[in-house]
C-alpha cells in the first residue's frame, strides 16, 4: 500500500498556501522563527513538595493501561485531517463522542488524543531552507486548552522537511512540560538535503529516533512527568532505516503506527509488516475518512491481531 502522489501533493499545497498567506485573524500567520526561546524549566525541578502530575484521566502510564483514540490534522486546511475542522473545542467534542465506539465491556478504557500537526512540511524552502513551518504557540495553546478541558492527550506531530526530528522536538519544550502532551514523528516527511516534500517519500535512521527518545526520557525524568506517548508513523519498510536498532526508554511509550491509506486488505497487510518483530514497542493503526477504500469499522479494527493500542483517524 502506498500513499498516492496526488494526495500528498494536494496536502503539501494546502499547507504551503497557509504558510505564505496565514488564516487571517482566526489563526494568524505561522511564524517563520518557530516557537521562540526555550522556557524557564526551573519550576519543574522542585517536585518534592507537590504530588507528581497525572495523566488527563488519572495515573502516570498510558500503555498498556489505556487504548488511545486520536484524531489527526491541523486548522490550516481540512485536507490535513479531521482535527482541524471547526474550533478546537468542537474538535475535542467530536473526538470524545467518536472515541466511545472503541470502549466496551472487557476492553481497556479509552484515552482520547488530539494529534495536531505541530510542524508542517512545505513544498517551498522557506526563509531557512528547511521546507517546513512550525505552528505558532497561539495555535498550539488553543488545542492544548481544548484537550485539557476534554481530559485528552495532545500529540504534536512533526513533519520536519529538511530539518531533523530532535531539533523540532526541542522547539516544543514549553508544551512537553505539560503532562498531557506527547510527540509523533512522521518519517514520510523527513527529507534528505536535496529532497522536496511531496515529491518523494522520506525516511529516517533509527539513530535519529533514538536521539529524540533519549532527550525526551531525560526531560520526563527531570520533571517527574508521567509517561510520554511517542508515535512513529510508517507505511513502507524503508521508512525507518535500521529499525531493529530502535531503543526502549524509561518514561516513553513508543508506538509503531501503520500509516497509509487503501483497502482493508492492503491496510491489514501493512499493519502486519509494521508491527512484525516490534519487540517492546506498542502497536498503532491509522485510518482515513476520505482516502481509505471502504473505511474499516471499529469492530473490524478491533479484530486485527495484535489489537492496535493506538487508533488514529485522519
Residue ranges and their predicted role:
Residues 38-89:
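N-terminal module-boundary/linker segments of secreted carbohydrate-active enzymes
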Residues 66-70, 109-115, 151-155, 180-184, ...:
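Structural preference for beta-strand elements that scaffold enzyme active sites
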Residues 75-77, 118-120, 160-162, 187-191, ...:
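Active-site-proximal loop/turn and secondary-structure-junction residues that shape catalytic pockets
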Residues 24-45:
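C-terminal region of N-terminal signal peptides and the immediate post-cleavage residues
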Residues 1-19:
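N-terminal export and membrane-targeting signals
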Residues 84-85, 125-133, 197-206:
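Glycine-rich tight-turn/loop motif centered on a GG-T
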Residues 199-313:
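Surface-exposed substrate-engagement region within the catalytic domains
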Residues 101-102, 109-189:
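Substrate-binding cleft of extracellular glycoside hydrolase catalytic domains
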Amino acid at each position: 500500500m502506498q500513499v498516492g502522489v496526488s494526495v500528498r501533493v494536494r496536502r503539501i499545497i494546502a499547507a504551503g498556501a497557509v504558510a505564505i498567506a496565514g488564516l487571517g485573524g482566526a489563526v494568524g500567520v505561522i511564524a517563520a522563527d518557530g516557537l521562540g526561546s526555550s522556557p524557564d524549566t526551573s519550576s519543574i525541578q522542585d517536585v518534592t513538595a507537590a504530588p507528581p502530575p497525572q495523566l488527563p484521566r488519572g495515573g502516570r502510564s498510558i500503555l498498556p493501561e489505556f487504548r488511545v483514540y486520536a484524531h489527526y490534522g491541523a486548522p490550516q486546511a481540512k485536507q490535513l485531517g479531521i482535527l482541524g475542522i471547526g474550533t478546537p473545542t468542537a474538535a475535542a467534542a467530536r473526538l470524545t463522542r467518536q472515541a466511545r465506539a472503541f470502549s466496551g465491556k472487557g476492553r481497556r478504557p479509552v484515552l482520547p488524543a488530539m494529534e495536531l500537526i505541530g510542524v508542517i512540511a512545505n513544498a517551498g524552502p522557506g526563509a531557512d531552507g528547511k521546507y517546513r513551518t512550525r505552528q505558532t504557540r497561539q495555535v498550539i495553546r488553543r488545542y492544548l486548552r481544548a484537550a485539557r478541558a476534554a481530559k485528552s492527550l495532545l500529540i504534536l506531530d512533526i513533519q520536519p522537511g529538511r530539518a531533523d526530528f530532535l531539533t523540532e522536538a526541542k522547539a516544543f519544550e514549553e508544551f512537553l512540560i505539560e503532562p498531557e502532551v506527547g510527540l509523533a514523528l512522521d518519517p514520510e516527511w523527513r527529507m534528505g538535503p536535496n529532497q522536496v516534500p511531496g515529491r518523494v517519500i522520506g525516511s529516517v535512521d533509527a539513530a535519529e529516533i533514538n536521539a529524540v527518545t533519549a532527550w525526551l526520557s531525560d526531560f520526563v525524568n527531570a520533571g517527574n512527568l508521567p509517561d510520554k506517548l511517542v508515535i512513529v508513523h510508517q507505511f513502507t519498510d524503508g521508512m525507518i532505516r535500521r529499525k531493529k536498532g530502535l531503543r526502549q526508554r524509561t518514561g516513553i511509550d513508543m508506538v509503531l503506527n501503520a500509516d497509509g491509506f487503501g483497502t482493508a486488505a492492503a491496510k491489514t497487510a501493512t499493519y502486519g509488516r509494521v508491527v512484525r518483530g516490534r519487540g517492546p514497542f506498542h502497536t498503532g493503526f491509522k485510518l482515513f475518512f476520505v482516502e481509505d477504500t471502504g473505511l474499516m469499522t471499529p469492530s473490524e479494527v478491533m479484530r486485527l491481531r495484535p489489537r492496535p493500542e493506538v487508533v488514529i483517524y485522519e
